[in-house]
């Protein structure tokens, strides 16, 4: 919902404009359904509710101070030189669903006892029902020296995890011809856990195209113990890593970057390592920052002890405040935080919200479906699809075989089809992930 602290100076003019606009909003407003966050989850929820015949009179509001909406899965394409930044962003005002009231307000806390959200602009917004979709914070400042390195174009340090840094990734890949390249993934929960290695595989592929691959020593340094959380795909990616001569530095979490000395410092998380510091010299460094719940969410009454909005993993309903639901990256749903996951969460949330409004039992169930279209090079992609428990749930296995094998068809889905689908169907409430444009049955059939 907001700019990363490390990049906030660039956002100041927009904030002044929003404060001016907000003065025309009454100090107190009320809507039947209030959605906090106009990212993929919030927009899609608003659109599906607005399209729903079960809601009756539509009175939906969405709160988000952003001026631009980003198709974040497209940032890997931008960093790989396959798309321009303009291709993967739109003015937020252009994609708010018709009939939905947009308030460009910055929420700073939730007041669930009074069915209210409070904003920095002094406006209190009350609701009958709340959908919390605040997203998460990409914490660039969580790595010492990283913000400064990212602001120096000569540092050879870059990241696909912000619209303000992603274009530098492709420039760095093109300019790099020889030396030590390190790609990092932090420990803990992040958005799209496959993205840190997607950009690595695409860089490797580009360097191979340019004939310089043999002059570059590549390391994948991850805080995780394996290449991927789902065993089936992790095994395939580990085989690919070894086949392509990529060094694996597992359970090593990046904690500091010295751009001048070209040194990255990691904390060894392995059992018995006692958190020892490990330093690695680099000539090229791609960093994925640590990520966490927004502080204002974590400190609120609707957050659990881990800081995420505390909801039932099957119904998406809050565990304490029954008129609150949460989806997307800011929720406690224990799955991969991806756009594909949101495509499966929203219909469940909508059906359960409508059931609650009608005084009925909440029967819709989210099974944890998520997908990671994992680029492994030009003209190839591993389409990882799975549900809770790391159980594969593959859409195209009957056609192409097991999806752990990279496929050119999947590559063009990611590169050409999915961006079009996102802008023309997904955020308009007409896309349902593996069900495509057919709305899924969200209530499990009784055997």
PLM region spans:
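Short glycine-enriched, charge-decorated loop/helix-capping segments at active-site entrances
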Residues: 75-82, 147-148, 155, 302
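A Rossmann-like FAD-binding core segment of flavoenzymes
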Residues: 21, 57-59, 100-109, 117, ...
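C-terminal auxiliary extensions adjacent to catalytic cores
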Residues: 383-447
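FAD-site-proximal beta/loop scaffold in flavoenzymes
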Residues: 150-177, 281-344, 354
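Internal hydrophobic alpha-helix adjacent to the cofactor/substrate pocket in enzyme cavities
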Residues: 205, 342-368
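FAD-binding core/adjacent interface of flavoenzyme oxidoreductases
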Residues: 4-30, 100-198, 202-211, 286
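Beta1-alpha1 glycine-rich phosphate/pyrophosphate-binding loop at the start
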Residues: 25-101, 187-231, 437, 441-446
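Short glycine-rich anion-binding loops that position phosphate/pyrophosphate groups of nucleotides
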Residues: 41, 135-138, 291-293
């Amino acid at each position: 919902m907001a700019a990363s602290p490390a990049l906030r100076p660039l956002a100041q003019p927009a904030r002044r404009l929003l404060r001016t606009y907000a003065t025309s909003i009454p100090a107190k407003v009320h809507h039947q359904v209030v959605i906090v966050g106009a990212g993929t989850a919030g927009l899609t929820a608003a659109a599906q509710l607005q399209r729903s015949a079960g809601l009756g009179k539509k009175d939906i509001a969405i709160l988000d101070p952003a001026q631009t909406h980003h198709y974040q899965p497209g940032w890997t394409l931008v960093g790989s030189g396959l798309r321009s930044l303009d291709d993967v962003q739109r003015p937020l005002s252009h994609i708010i669903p018709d009939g939905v009231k947009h308030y460009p307000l910055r929420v700073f806390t939730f007041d669930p006892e009074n069915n209210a959200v409070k904003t920095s602009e002094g406006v209190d917004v009350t609701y009958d029902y709340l959908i919390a979709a605040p997203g998460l914070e990409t914490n660039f400042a969580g790595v010492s020296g990283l913000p400064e390195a990212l602001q120096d174009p000569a540092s050879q340090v870059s990241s696909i995890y912000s619209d303000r840094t992603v274009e530098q990734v492709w420039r760095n890949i093109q300019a790099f011809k020889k030396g030590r390249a390190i790609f990092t993934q932090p420990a803990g929960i992040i958005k799209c856990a496959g993205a840190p290695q997607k950009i690595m595989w695409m860089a490797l592929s580009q360097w191979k195209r340019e004939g310089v691959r043999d002059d570059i020593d590549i390391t994948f340094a991850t805080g995780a113990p394996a290449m991927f959380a789902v065993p089936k795909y992790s095994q395939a990616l580990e085989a690919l890593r070894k086949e392509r001569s990529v060094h694996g530095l597992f359970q090593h979490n990046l904690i500091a970057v010295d751009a001048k000395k070209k040194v990255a410092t990691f904390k060894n998380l392995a059992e018995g390592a006692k958190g020892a510091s490990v330093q690695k010299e680099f000539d090229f460094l791609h960093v994925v920052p640590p990520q966490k719940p927004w502080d204002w969410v974590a400190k609120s009454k609707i957050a659990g002890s881990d800081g995420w909005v505390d909801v039932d993993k099957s119904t998406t309903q809050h565990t304490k405040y029954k008129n609150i639901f949460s989806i997307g990256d800011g929720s406690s749903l224990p799955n991969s935080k991806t756009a594909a996951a949101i495509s499966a969460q929203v219909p469940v949330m909508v059906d359960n919200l409508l059931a609650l409004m009608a005084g009925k039992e909440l029967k819709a169930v989210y099974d944890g479906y998520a997908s990671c279209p994992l680029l492994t090079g030009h003209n190839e992609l591993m389409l990882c699809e799975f549900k809770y428990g790391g159980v594969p749930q593959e859409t195209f296995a009957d056609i192409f075989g097991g999806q752990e094998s990279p496929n050119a068809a999947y590559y063009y889905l990611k590169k050409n089809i999915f961006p079009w689908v996102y802008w023309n169907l997904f955020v308009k409430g007409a896309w349902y992930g593996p069900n495509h444009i057919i709305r899924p049955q969200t209530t499990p059939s009784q055997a």
